[in-house]
């Protein structure tokens, strides 16, 4: 425990405590920095409805807040109807979002300074094609074949939001900033007192995305920092590398340039550390911890993490949030794929001089397949098919032009194929294409009050080309003598693209 506290103090002593230049007057918070740190223009906050607000507007809103004594009203009367005197009631949901987004920009300044202050020799060249989500899968394919066990971790989130404020106290010495943060959290917890705490957190996350991301990343960064400490204490092997997973390809070359960094404040998705026996990858609200060794070792790590969350973050997490599985006998959900490392039998013919014999061996293979049930569920929710996968028309789109209908269906189909091109089994993808193509035909037939067969005959090959994916275009150029769809389903090669930087592209087009 003494080592743990000493390690913690050493980490905190490195923090550059940044007294925020907020208090220009007794009660006015204003921005003193351009967020880009390169100019003097006021910071602009982009809201969800694409309106921009400058720091001057935020300053005026805070003055009005104090003039109307809203601090007392919000605590004493949290359930008053905000729609009754809307013009005089300042702290509406709209203004609350402006202030919280502005506050999030200000508290991110020290962490932006920390990134800018990194030595030039440690900088990593950033290339757009190296940020692809797909580039993590070749890394897993290369490393996971030699590991035994995998822990699938759902990173718990503290129910009490005061814990997040306490974590920031180590990094932020500006007391009024912390009071303002508590005010935001208090306001939403009071206003949502009639619902559960988890729903309150969800509402706060939805309405204050930037501030919530900052709080969540602060918590995750603290958790991963001490996870690194546990890793160092549990093994006599030196840590090979750790760092922000900025680029996710050419791993062996990049390992030489990585220094120890503490991520999370620029909305980065992935972070990792690795050594010959252990690999850690975090994505969204989950993490994967894979390693060699015995099952008992994995249970010790599970116990470490549960006790760590309980005694350091002061909240109890359920043991079922950490699943320990043997890689050879299980699959795991990762970035929209069901991945596994099965042992496949391989028959090898060996010949020595005049004698030949067969060797039956087993080889591990990193397998990625498409979760068919999940994707059909998305299509069903978007009313492209029934729950069992039977295509139906989309009545809400019948008012659009024929070209717009074809373009929307074709774009959804191409997005699904593009993201799941790394699947080792293409049959599910062609089933999804069939559902979307027939749903499109039924939508057009419904619009023109015709039958599906008649409309298909009228459009001909132009209708099929709209659903012709980029992957199939590549194969059609390679196999020019084949017919248009003769190669469909005949190849099982996985294709990983280097231009996919968001997993949300899978679901967003359906909504």
UniProtKB/Swiss-Prot annotation:
Pfam families given in the database record: Intron_maturas2, MatK_N
Superkingdom of the organism of origin: Eukaryota
Keyword presence, Translocase: no
Recorded coiled-coil stretches: none
UniProt keywords, alphabetically: Chloroplast, mRNA processing, Plastid, RNA-binding, tRNA processing
Any GO BP: tRNA processing
Primary location: plastid
InterPro entries attached to this UniProt entry: Domain_X, Maturase_MatK, Maturase_MatK_N
Localization of this protein: Plastid, Chloroplast
Keyword tRNA processing found: yes
Molecular function as annotated in GO: RNA binding
Cellular component terms (Gene Ontology): chloroplast
Similarity section: Belongs to the intron maturase 2 family. MatK subfamily.
Function: Usually encoded in the trnK tRNA gene intron. Probably assists in splicing its own and other chloroplast group II introns.
HAMAP family (alphabetical): MatK
Name this polypeptide is given: Maturase K
Organism expressing this protein natively: Hordeum lechleri (Wild barley)
Taxonomic lineage of the native organism: Eukaryota, Viridiplantae, Streptophyta, Embryophyta, Tracheophyta
Gene that this polypeptide is encoded by: matK
